[in-house]
Amino acid sequence: MDAIKENWTTVKEAVRREYSLSDISYHTWVEPLEFHNVVNDVVSIIIPSDQAHALNYISSKYKSFFQVTITEMFDHPYDISFIWKRM
């Protein structure tokens, strides 16, 4: 969905605001995330390769934050998938 891609920074900032993320948490875990695509109502989010070791942590900690935020912002139910970017 182009709307999610076009508003990706706004999505991340909404997650930061709605869930009261500290500056450190936001800059470490959320800011580096990149929108990849939407297929069958699943939003794929790229985790940079230097954070690949934290895939499980990021998924367990932030998946629901992104799912709720994106669903509310775009008025459509989405699931979230985190993938890591290979160099």
Please report, for each region that a protein language model flagged, where it lies by residue.
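Intrinsically disordered, low-complexity basic tails and flexible linkers associated
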Residues: 1-87
